[in-house]
C-alpha cells in the first residue's frame, strides 16, 4: 500500500514539474510579442537610395501592365514590383 501511495505522489510531483515548466515557457513566449514600432534585427535593413532608384526605374509587369513606363530599367537583385513600387522581397 505504501509503494502505491509513493508512486502516486511521485507521479503527481512529476506532473506538477512538467506543468510548471510548460507554463513558464508559454509565459515567456507571450512576453515576446512584437509591437508595430519594434524593429526586427533579423530582417535586412532597406537601402533608401535603392528604393528611390527602383521607384523611378521599375519596369516589372504586374497583372499584364508595367509598373513604370517602358524603356526604364527593371528592378533587379531580388527587388519586385508591388503597388507601383519596387520592394525588396
Curated annotation (Swiss-Prot):
Task: List, alphabetically, the GO terms of the cellular component aspect.
Answer: extracellular region
GO MF terms on file? calcium channel regulator activity; toxin activity
What intrachain disulfides are recorded?
Answer: 54-75, 58-81, 67-86
The free-text tissue note of the record is: Expressed by the venom gland.
From the UniProt annotation, give the residues forming the signal peptide.
1-23
Query: Record keywords: Disulfide bond included?
Result: yes
Q: Where in the cell is it found?
A: Secreted
Alphabetic keyword roster: Calcium channel impairing toxin, Disulfide bond, Ion channel impairing toxin, Neurotoxin, Secreted, Signal, Toxin, Voltage-gated calcium channel impairing toxin
Prosequence residues removed at maturation: 24-50
Q: What does this protein do?
A: Inhibits voltage-gated calcium channels (Cav) in rat cerebellar granule cells. Has insecticidal activity.
What family does the database annotate?
Belongs to the neurotoxin 12 (Hwtx-2) family. 06 (TXP1) subfamily.
Q: Can you say what this protein is called?
A: Omega-theraphotoxin-Ba1c
